Amino acid sequence: MSAVNQANYAALIRRYFAACNAGDHAALLSCFTPDAVHYFPAGLPDIPWRTAETIAAKWVWCVENLGSQWTIEKILVSHDSHEAVIEWTHWKGKLGTALRGDEWYVFDEQSGLIKEIRAYYASPADKEVAINELVDFDYTGRGYNLEPANAHTKSGAAK
């Protein structure tokens, strides 16, 4: 694994948010690998957003149609993996609303660009599904737990 440059990754996230706020399509593209994916919880149309082009176009649309602006509340960059997590607020000026959430970033080791974002935010649980999770994210392939740790014990209590 190549060395992790925490300052560069934090600066890239800030540059990404500045490009979002400016609705700058070219600047947004420059933050991502061409095949980047942005995952979201259920409720938005056409998710996940696949490719840098799609991600850039969707954020420009939000700025133009919703009056979107974002603030970064916190950034935490890993010291031993090419990942980061942030807290943000998405201000929807034309709607007079805001949404708070977190995002998990995965960076491409060679280019240093964003290759994946997983968004988690304050939204109501969907009572129609057994597990509320990101749409089309490969939880199984990534090794996530698919049931509680104590699911196989007789009483349900941890051993």
Annotate each language-model stretch with its function:
Residues A3, N8, V60-K159:
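A beta-strand edge to alpha-helix "cap/lid" segment located at domain peripheries
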Residues A19-A22, A36, P41, A84, ...:
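Small-side-chain structural scaffolding
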Residues H25-S81:
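A solvent-exposed, acidic/Ser-Thr-rich amphipathic alpha-helical stretch
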